[in-house]
């Protein structure tokens, strides 16, 4: 595998199907057209919304995700080059600063965390040391928050998105990059525009 596309899905929450379809199409494009074997990693996020109609006594004790994303879910730490994809860091989607406190995971280089916001920042280092970054993915699932102050804030800051992690050589990756996704599932990654009609090259001369 040369490229990993990382996003996050919340439990008991509908998936943005247009986003998922476009992400799969982009994965196939990178693999077949660009010749770089690509995989999709979806981080499972857990959140209990007591004001959701499906939160009855039977469902409170169980976690489930939409069938469409089950095959892409990862539940542990994924080491990819010098990037750590932390699929078991259970960060509340209403957290204001989701990367705070996770700097310790950046031992080798970069860290990717699952969260509903699109965050990216570089980490302190000594001169000559390897660049280290930490970022969050954004969600592939729709808004599903409690009717509370924290829930209302979380809904306002909810972002669709994913992170592209690409190997530079055997042991290192290029800096992971955030890709923001529109509500209709379309997105732009560098010079590639992806929507329901497929993947298109952007004319950089315009």
Predicted segment positions?
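Extended recognition/assembly regions associated with phosphoester-bond processing machinery
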Residues: 1-206
């Amino acid at each position: 595998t040369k490229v990993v596309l990382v996003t996050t899905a919340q439990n008991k929450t509908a998936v943005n199907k247009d986003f998922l379809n476009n992400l799969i199409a982009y994965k196939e494009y990178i693999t077949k057209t660009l010749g770089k074997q690509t995989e999709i990693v979806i981080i499972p996020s857990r959140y209990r919304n007591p004001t959701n109609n499906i939160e009855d006594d039977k469902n409170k004790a169980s976690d489930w995700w939409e069938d469409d994303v089950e095959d892409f879910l990862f539940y542990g730490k994924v080491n990819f080059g010098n990037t750590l994809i932390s699929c078991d860091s259970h960060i509340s989607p209403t957290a204001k600063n989701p990367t705070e406190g996770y700097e310790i995971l950046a031992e080798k280089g970069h860290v990717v965390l699952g969260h509903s916001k699109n965050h990216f920042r570089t980490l302190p280092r000594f001169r000559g040391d390897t660049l280290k970054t930490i970022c969050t993915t954004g969600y592939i699932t729709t808004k599903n928050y409690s009717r509370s102050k924290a829930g209302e804030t979380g809904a306002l800051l909810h972002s669709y998105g994913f992170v592209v992690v690409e190997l530079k050589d055997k042991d290192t990756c290029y800096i992971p990059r955030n890709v923001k996704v529109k509500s209709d599932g379309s997105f732009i990654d560098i010079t590639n525009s992806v929507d329901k009609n497929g993947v298109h090259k952007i004319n950089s001369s315009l």
